Amino acid sequence: MAEVEETLKRIQSHKGVIGTMVVNAEGIPIRTTLDNSTTVQYAGLLHQLTMKAKSTVRDIDPQNDLTFLRIRSKKHEIMVAPDKEYLLIVIQNPCE
């Protein structure tokens, strides 16, 4: 568990990172650096989006799988790294 904490601290220390969260397979936040309401909102919506993206990738090619999802808007850049049991979500300010 210490390795996970170290990794999250390292990610959080990068310039521009607003917050990180780890979400379980059901979309429930396990670890977060954001406030509760923001965490619940992002976790629920990004979990749904990631599951839909994963399903779409599999529909296109059943041998393939989603490994990373990056969403960039004017305000934020959201990166999602899905695993079998968890999602790692990082929210940062987009680089200019």
Curated annotation (Swiss-Prot):
One Gene Ontology molecular-function label: dynein intermediate chain binding
Organism: Bos taurus (Bovine)
SMART domains: Robl_LC7
UniProt KW keywords: Acetylation, Cytoplasm, Cytoskeleton, Dynein, Microtubule, Motor protein, Transport
Subunit structure: Homodimer. The cytoplasmic dynein 1 complex consists of two catalytic heavy chains (HCs) and a number of non-catalytic subunits presented by intermediate chains (ICs), light intermediate chains (LICs) and light chains (LCs); the composition seems to vary in respect to the IC, LIC and LC composition. The heavy chain homodimer serves as a scaffold for the probable homodimeric assembly of the respective non-catalytic subunits. The ICs and LICs bind directly to the HC dimer and the LCs assemble on the IC dimer. Interacts with DYNC1I1 and DYNC1I2. Self-associates. Interacts with DYNLRB1.
Record-linked Pfam families: Robl_LC7
Protein name (database record): Dynein light chain roadblock-type 2
Gene Ontology annotations of biological process type: microtubule-based movement
Keyword Transmembrane: no
Record-stated family: Belongs to the GAMAD family.
Gene3D superfamilies xref list: Dynein light chain 2a, cytoplasmic
Subcellular location: Cytoplasm, Cytoskeleton
Modified residues (N-acetylalanine): A2
